[in-house]
Amino acid sequence: MKIVALLIVFISLYAGGSMQRCQSYVQEVRRAHWSQFGVDYPYQYGVGQLVQESGCRNILSLDGVGSEGLSQITYRLWQKPLKAKGVEGIKSIPDQLKAQAIIMRSVWVSKYGLWATYQVYNGGGLVLKEINRAGVDDWEKAKDQCKRGQSCFTYKGIKTCRSNCDINYEYSQNIFKYGGQYGTVKESSQYRYW
């Protein structure tokens, strides 16, 4: 029982700390996303993405591919398009947030909801193939078409495996949930989420 109580306290402290940390980046995320998408873009989802990616911590991931910063960008993969847009590196937080918005703009497919764009950012273009197989821009129907492998992780000697479909499709749900915590999301037909 004590362990459960301590776990609840830890989770609530972590979540509260994440909320405060992320709040300090809201205006920078807004500026970065509006510079790429225009002022109708619901930038709150960009903040939600930082919550999902790093808990708004400027960290180097242990993912094995070199993802770094608040938005967990693998710079070596995005170096050329980012440099073309004036981002020479992502060591500074302002550059990380600019890079996040630039990447989001480059993977955005305007005929689909933003959920698909966030999933492309997270897991590549497979979601676009799943939408095509489903024949409709619908999260649930696209997920039904998902046929991916698993990712396995070992932590403290315990191996855990998860479906890559579950990981990628939960990602867009989390962005939606977390984004709503950073102000009223003003959706438009141009930038609908679902």
Give, region by region, the residue ranges found by the protein language model.
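Short alpha-helical scaffolding segments that buttress acidic/His motifs in well-ordered protein cores
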Residues: 46-50, 118-121
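Non-catalytic cell-wall polysaccharide-engagement segments
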Residues: 13-39, 56-57, 75-194
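Sec-dependent N-terminal signal peptides
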Residues: 3-13
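Short glycine- and hydrophobic/aromatic-rich loop-to-beta-strand nucleating segment
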Residues: 71-73
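Extracytoplasmic
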Residues: 42-45, 68
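Short hydrophobic/aromatic-rich motifs at helix boundaries and adjacent loops
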Residues: 18-19, 49-51
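Short Gly/aromatic-enriched secondary-structure transition segments
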Residues: 64-66
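Conserved alpha-helical segments that form or flank metal/cofactor-binding pockets of metalloenzymes
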Residues: 50-62
